[in-house]
């Protein structure tokens, strides 16, 4: 059961190794997900792949006929770090609930981005090529499409800040000049240097994340890290 499945490429590798009988990909975009399911079933003819359109931050009802035993919830990458800690624990609890009872033998396989030197984080979240900056400014273009505002993305500068106390990277957009932004029914003056806080990315130690898993009802875990200790994959079960 993959949350935020996208094109299912990570799940494809895992399915080749684990040989599951069923796969459920969950994502907000159903059409794209269905296409990925067809590709999975074409390449892995023994696999029954299903697409489920859902917002993973909301309660999810799995198919009624999905086998209860030995479910594996798969949440790769490190997206759990984009949620506030209390919300992350709620999501982990929801993942645990998908597994059924402890005797059903289910588990969670999840990735987390570990703490690392500040200069490494800064280079990743404020890269020289400007990829992250463009991604962050695109938030304003998206807001314009959604609500009809008139933000000019080029009038804002991307800034990434590491908060060592909270162990998180914060992404901000900083106004490059005084500007008035309008939207239907209102507007707002932004002064030069004023910031919009767009995103957080928490960097949990294995110990801190283990405590969160315990809060969510997981009793056992094992983990793997890369040689530098910058990323971890954790298998947790009840």
Locations of regions flagged by a protein language model:
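Conserved SAM-binding loop of SAM-dependent methyltransferases across substrates and taxa
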Residues: 7-19
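Conserved SAM-binding motif I beta-strand of class I
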Residues: 22-27
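Conserved SAM/SAH-binding beta-strand->alpha-helix loop
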Residues: 29-31
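Conserved SAM-binding strand-loop segment of SAM-dependent methyltransferases
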Residues: 44-58
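A short, conserved alpha-helix within the catalytic core of class I
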Residues: 82-97
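Conserved beta-strand signature within the Rossmann-like core of class I S-adenosyl-L-methionine
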Residues: 97-115
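Substrate-binding/catalytic lobe of Class I Rossmann-like enzymes that use SAM or dcSAM, i.e.
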Residues: 120-216
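Core SAM-dependent methyltransferase catalytic element
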Residues: 175, 226-238
């Amino acid at each position: 059961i993959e949350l935020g499945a996208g094109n299912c490429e990570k799940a494809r590798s895992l399915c080749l190794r684990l040989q599951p009988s069923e796969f459920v990909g969950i994502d907000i975009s159903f059409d794209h997900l269905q296409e990925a399911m067809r590709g999975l079933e074409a390449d892995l003819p023994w696999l029954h792949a299903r697409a489920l359109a859902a917002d993973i931050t909301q309660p999810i009802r799995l198919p009624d006929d999905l086998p209860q035993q030995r479910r594996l919830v798969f949440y790769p990458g490190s997206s759990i770090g984009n949620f506030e800690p209390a919300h992350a624990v709620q999501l982990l609890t929801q993942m645990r609930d998908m597994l059924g009872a402890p005797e059903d033998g289910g588990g969670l396989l999840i990735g987390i981005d570990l703490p690392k030197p500040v200069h490494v984080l800064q280079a990743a979240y404020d890269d020289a090529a400007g990829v992250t900056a463009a991604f962050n400014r695109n938030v304003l273009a998206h807001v314009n499409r959604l609500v009809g505002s008139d933000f000019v993305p080029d009038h804002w500068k991307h800034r990434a800040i590491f908060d060592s106390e909270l162990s998180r990277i914060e992404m901000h957009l900083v106004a490059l000049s005084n500007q008035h932004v309008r939207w239907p029914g209102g507007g707002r003056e932004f002064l030069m240097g004023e910031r919009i806080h767009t995103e957080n990315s928490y960097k949990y130690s294995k110990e801190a994340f283990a405590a969160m898993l315990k809060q969510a009802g997981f009793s056992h875990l094992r983990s793997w890290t890369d040689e530098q200790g910058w990323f971890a994959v954790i298998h947790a079960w009840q």
